[in-house]
Amino acid sequence: MDTRLINIGFGNIVAAGRVIAIVSPESAPIKRIISDARERGQLVDATYGRRTRAVIITDSGHVILSAIQPETVANRFLTAKVGAPEEPE
């Protein structure tokens, strides 16, 4: 399993292997996903009271709100993937 960690702002970190999507929160379907996750108790607000700029969806159904841009999160995700040494088989 992928054990690399991605910083999503303000000292909050998620496991890279669990991330399915990193999206912007403006569209109605994403707002609905956030609302549904809040009702299910699977919403993690990592914005520290700031404006939500990225929504991270995990394979466990959790929805994580971040105050940094989706592009920034994606770049950190790609850097962690490329910069890490290959695991032996």
From Swiss-Prot:
Transmembrane segments: none annotated. Belongs to the RemA family. This is Putative regulatory protein CYA_2696. Pfam families: RemA-like (PF04025). The lineage of its organism: Bacteria, Bacillati, Cyanobacteriota, Cyanophyceae, Synechococcales.
